[in-house]
C-alpha cells in the first residue's frame, strides 16, 4: 500500500517562538492516530522562524480519516499554532508514494 506525506510549511512571529516550541512539543505527545506512522517538525535552514510539519501516513485511507480521529485538545493546539503563524505564510503539500517504480 502506498504511503502519503502531508506537510504544512509556515513562518511564525519571532516574538512567539518559545510559545510555538511548547505547543509543538505538546502536539507531538498527543498526535496518535491509526495509520499515522510519524510526525516531525523541522526548521527550514536559512529562514528564521520558518518551520515544516511532516506527517507520514501508512495509506491514503489513513490520511483521509485523520481529521475524524482528532480530539478536542488537539484541535485547541492546532488552532493555537494557526494563531502563531504570520499571515499568508502557510503552504500545504500532499504527496502520494509511487509504488510502481
Q: What do these predicted regions represent?
A:
Residues 92-101:
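Short, low-order "capping/linker" segments at domain edges
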Residues 1-4, 100-101:
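Short, Lys/Arg-enriched, disordered terminal segments
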Residues 28-52:
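Short, glycine- and small/hydrophobic-rich beta-strand elements in well-ordered beta-sheets
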Residues 13-15, 46, 58-60:
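Short coil/turn motifs at secondary-structure junctions
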Residues 30-38, 56-92:
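An amphipathic, aromatic/His-enriched active-site/gating alpha helix that lines ligand/cofactor pockets
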Residues 11-22:
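Short, surface-exposed ligand-recognition loops at beta-strand->loop->(often short) alpha-helix junctions
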Residues 4-10, 52:
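Active-site-flanking beta-strand signature of metal-NTP-handling nucleotidyl enzymes
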Amino acid at each position: 500500500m502506498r504511503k502519503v506525506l502531508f506537510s504544512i510549511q509556515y513562518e511564525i512571529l519571532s516574538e512567539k517562538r518559545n510559545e510555538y516550541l511548547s505547543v509543538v512539543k505538546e502536539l507531538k505527545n498527543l498526535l496518535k492516530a491509526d495509520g499515522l506512522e510519524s510526525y516531525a517538525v523541522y526548521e527550514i535552514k536559512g529562514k528564521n522562524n520558518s518551520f515544516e510539519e511532516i506527517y507520514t501516513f501508512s495509506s491514503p485511507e489513513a490520511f483521509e480519516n485523520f481529521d475524524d480521529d482528532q480530539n478536542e485538545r488537539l484541535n485547541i493546539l492546532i488552532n493555537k499554532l494557526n494563531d502563531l503563524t504570520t499571515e499568508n505564510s502557510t503552504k500545504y503539500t500532499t504527496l502520494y508514494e509511487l509504488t510502481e517504480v
